[in-house]
Amino acid sequence: MEGLTKFLSSAPVLIMALLTFTAGILIEFNRFYPDLLFHPLG
């Protein structure tokens, strides 16, 4: 059990969880508001 908690508190697992969470937020935002992420610069 101690090894499992050490693995779950390691940096790569936290980075992957954060990236997955951020990607999910971006995907859902893009699903509801598809035009807001791609503003023309003109």
Swiss-Prot record:
Where is it mostly found? membrane
Establish whether keyword Transmembrane is in the entry.
yes
Where in or outside the cell? Cellular thylakoid membrane
Which membrane topology term applies here?
Single-pass membrane protein
Record's function text: May help in the organization of the PsaE and PsaF subunits.
| Protein family | Belongs to the PsaJ family.
Protein known as: Photosystem I reaction center subunit IX
Q: Which organism is it from?
A: Microcystis aeruginosa (strain NIES-843 / IAM M-2473)
Question: What phylogenetic lineage does the species belong to?
Answer: Bacteria, Bacillati, Cyanobacteriota, Cyanophyceae, Oscillatoriophycideae
